[in-house]
Amino acid sequence: MSRGERGLSASVEAAIILPVLVLFLGLLISSARISIAQQHVDSAAASGARAASLERGSRAAESAARDAVEAALVASDTGCSTLQVGVEAAALEAPLASAGSVRVEITCEASLSDVALPLIPGGVTLNSARSSPVDPLRGR
């Protein structure tokens, strides 16, 4: 039995398969974009925690962490429509020779509007939290 006798032509097969392949490719691209954006947010949180751990007080640590997070996200071209940065810097107020760490938490609303396909949301919320140790013997 030849292909013509089965009743399906190449154009009909392509018309059925092509939309599925395009949708799969779109999902693959959006998944990759989300994964890369999450890596950038993780890196920004680590940069913020490191910058905060080098400061002498809680207020300076919060400011340094926010500046470092924003700079890292701008450098990686990760656009956050909404950015929240939380800093836990109580370890900076601990007495000399006390071990501790500074923790930075980030919540970023990233846009996926340039990958506009059905079933793909227009944005995604990315969360990350990182810690950095405070040097227990540094001057306070």
Predicted regions and their residues:
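Alpha-helical assembly-interface signal, strongest on the long, hydrophobic N-terminal helix that forms
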Residues: 1-69
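Short, conserved structural patches
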Residues: 54, 58-140
